[in-house]
Amino acid sequence: LVFDPSCAGVYDRVLLGKLNRLCDDCYNVFREPNVATECRSNCFYNLAFVQCLEYLLPPSLHEEYQANVQMV
């Protein structure tokens, strides 16, 4: 897991791994070269991450993932 200097919050390998996995899954679904990179940009605080979240996970988990982004 590569540390992203744009992440100014808590360095938590478990949280970062969870957020990274969502971006990887999103790339695996769409197979667009920039999806994973865009999803991780600005420490996951971006539209691509939100779109991946909405596409891949049930609404009941959206708030939890958004809270995780705020923590890292």
Curated annotation (Swiss-Prot):
Membrane-spanning ranges: none
UniProt keyword Repeat present: no
InterPro entries referenced in this protein's UniProt entry, alphabetically: Crust_neurhormone_CS, Crust_neurohorm, Crust_neurohorm_sf, Hyperglycemic, Hyperglycemic1
Tissue: Produced by the medulla terminalis X-organ in the eyestalks and transported to the sinus gland where they are stored and released.
Keyword field: Amidation, Carbohydrate metabolism, Disulfide bond, Glucose metabolism, Hormone, Neuropeptide, Secreted
Disulfide-linked positions: C7-C43, C23-C39, C26-C52
Positions where Valine amide occurs in the chain: V72
Family as reported in the entry's similarity comment: Belongs to the arthropod CHH/MIH/GIH/VIH hormone family.
Record keyword Disulfide bond present: yes
Species annotation: Penaeus japonicus
BP term (GO), one: glucose metabolic process
Protein name per its UniProtKB record: Crustacean hyperglycemic hormone 6
Top-level lineage group: Eukaryota
Pfam family, one: Crust_neurohorm
